[in-house]
Amino acid sequence: MTQQLPILSLKKIYSGKVRDLYEIDDKRMLMVTSDRLSAFDVILDDPIPRKGEILTQISNFWFNKLAHIMPNHFTGDSVYDVLPKEEADLIRDRAVVCKRLNPIKIESIVRGYLTGSGLKDYKQTGTICGLKLPEGLVEASKLPEAIFTPSSKEEVGNHDINISYAECEKLIGADLAAQVKEKAIALYTVAAEYALTKGIIICDTKFEFGLDENGTLTLMDEVLTPDSSRFWSVDTYQAGTNPPSFDKQFVRDWLENSGWNKQAPAPKVPENIIQKTVDKYQEALDLLTK
């Protein structure tokens, strides 16, 4: 599957790091998940075969499983309702028909464990996004409770920046910030409890929310995939280590050790790293959904 996925009968209205959006009408759009991979906010040249299909299956699983917590972007339409059969056949496993929503202008990140940028902030200040944490935590420590740590939503190619909850309130308003925080933590908590029963620890994740035409907060984009989350295996988890993950952390770790300056273009990722990444995505899907 190539990185570009032309949908000839619909107008493309947006191309993101991984997803392309096509206009259906003023209420609906088609979201197509490509095999593109981004790391450190740079889109890599090498696609990950079948990644888009696996991500779509994982997302759809979670959207359905978490539907009791809040509305989501599903319209109930099939790709066959909006595309000619020959086009729908090509992208049916990597596309969904979704509502056109007004996106909330923050990244809604929930952390249950300490790692990544959160660990760096903690080591420097003892806090993440202004939240004071207990002393003595180490890499991969389980936090006393899940925390909401928003970041700014930057344009493609720019790095998102961790912000405090007060800054989040300034950006989107206090009422909406409170709703987003409550729902994000509720979604993470239910998902993390379920994933544990399947042998997966959800270390942290990023949710995307939007408002519908009535101002209703709605879950959108992707949910709890290896692209938006860090998944660890219960079997290999140990506090004080950097646990191996089911996600693009494989590629991120390779890039971290490659000497790359994290500016585009990224170096070519070896074939064996790409294959290991595909295998990890597939393993996550199999564990969660079987």
From Swiss-Prot:
<protein>
    <recommendedName>
        <fullName>Phosphoribosylaminoimidazole-succinocarboxamide synthase</fullName>
        <ecNumber>6.3.2.6</ecNumber>
    </recommendedName>
</protein>
<dbReference type="Pfam" id="PF01259">
    <property type="entry name" value="SAICAR_synt"/>
</dbReference>
<keyword id="KW-0436">Ligase</keyword>
<comment type="pathway">
    <text>Purine metabolism; IMP biosynthesis via de novo pathway; 5-amino-1-(5-phospho-D-ribosyl)imidazole-4-carboxamide from 5-amino-1-(5-phospho-D-ribosyl)imidazole-4-carboxylate: step 1/2.</text>
</comment>
<dbReference type="GO" id="GO:0006189">
    <property type="term" value="P:'de novo' IMP biosynthetic process"/>
</dbReference>
<keyword id="KW-0547">Nucleotide-binding</keyword>
<keyword id="KW-0067">ATP-binding</keyword>
<comment type="similarity">
    <text>Belongs to the SAICAR synthetase family.</text>
</comment>
<dbReference type="GO" id="GO:0004639">
    <property type="term" value="F:phosphoribosylaminoimidazolesuccinocarboxamide synthase activity"/>
</dbReference>
<keyword id="KW-0658">Purine biosynthesis</keyword>
<dbReference type="InterPro" id="IPR028923">
    <property type="entry name" value="SAICAR_synt/ADE2_N"/>
</dbReference>
<dbReference type="GO" id="GO:0005524">
    <property type="term" value="F:ATP binding"/>
</dbReference>
<dbReference type="InterPro" id="IPR001636">
    <property type="entry name" value="SAICAR_synth"/>
</dbReference>
<dbReference type="InterPro" id="IPR018236">
    <property type="entry name" value="SAICAR_synthetase_CS"/>
</dbReference>
